[in-house]
Amino acid sequence: DLAMSVEGVGSAGGRDIGGQDGMDLGMAAVNWETMMLEYAGANNPLYVVRRSELQELKPNKFAICSFEPNTKNYDVQKFPLESSDTLFLATDGFVDQFGGPHGKKFMRRRFRELLVETASLPVMEHEAHLKHQFEAWRGEEEQVDDVLVVSVRVP
């Protein structure tokens, strides 16, 4: 259970860390023998790029440890993998970054296109490619949030 996996996140050493913030999270597990992916997410989707086509595994639209803990269950989705699929999990920092010629957000549509482009590269080039694209978009704008993109190529 996704909520149980992060039990205690909303406190620090038994003391409340305050606020009404939750945590966005995506968790994935792969059974390499059956090539089956299991995914559960709290506001963070998982993307699978297969032969230049992107599939998005949608998350539940509520955060971990938000407002009333232990009141919501997270859906676990199963997805059959194929060799050379590329999986991406990311925080929302990339899509929420302001930049470009008009100081607008990067947005999900552009991010999805970038993931398809990135998946066509050797996996060892993913980090440099994503970092370059992020910096080019950001330009002189301040970075607004943490940015993490994890990519995995299925052998």
Locations of the language-model features?
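Conserved subregion of the PPM/PP2C metallophosphatase catalytic domain
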Residues: 1-155
